[in-house]
């Protein structure tokens, strides 16, 4: 089970109280493998990592090599910044499926995130 702790889209309904409750329940439950974090805000992702520790995974949407705002209110941060802030797995959508060569772009995301992981550890 992955719990939604943060969202990167503008205007989302998650409050700090919600986030704290999710983290409190998720860190004490062995059935929870990890949390969904905010890839658009590395500082928030780093705070999530501090709160959940190294025993839980953080999966991170909201990353794109083209940092900025999306068409439907989503915000994107750079995948390397997300990994350096504590993300264990980046979730990439439009950055790959809208590319002219999706396979090549997937390799690029893989390399960028792998390089960041090597820098982090």
Where are these regions (language model features)?
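C-terminal helical cap(s) of enzyme catalytic domains, especially alpha/beta-barrels
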Residues: 81-86, 94-121
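A short pocket-lining beta-strand/turn micro-motif at the edge of beta-sheets
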Residues: 54-56, 86-92
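Catalytic cores of alpha/beta
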Residues: 46-48, 67-88, 104-108
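Electropositive phosphate-/nucleotide-binding environments in soluble metabolic enzymes
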Residues: 16, 20, 42, 76, ...
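Conserved anion-binding
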Residues: 1-57, 65-68
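Short, surface-exposed linear patches
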Residues: 23-26, 57-58, 80-83, 112-114
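Glycine-rich beta-strand-to-loop/alpha-helix junction loops that act as flexible
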Residues: 60-63, 92-95
């Amino acid at each position: 089970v992955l719990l939604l702790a943060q969202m990167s889209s503008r205007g989302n309904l998650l409050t700090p109280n919600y986030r704290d409750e999710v983290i409190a329940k998720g860190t004490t439950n062995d059935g929870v493998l990890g949390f969904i974090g905010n890839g658009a805000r590395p500082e928030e992702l780093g705070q999530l990592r501090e709160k959940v520790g190294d025993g839980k995974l953080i999966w991170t949407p909201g990353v794109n090599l083209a940092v900025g705002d999306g068409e439907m209110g989503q915000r994107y941060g750079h995948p390397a910044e997300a990994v350096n802030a504590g993300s264990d797995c980046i979730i990439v959508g439009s950055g790959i499926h809208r590319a002219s060569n999706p396979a090549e772009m997937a390799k690029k995301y893989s390399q960028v995130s792998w390089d960041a992981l090597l820098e982090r550890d």
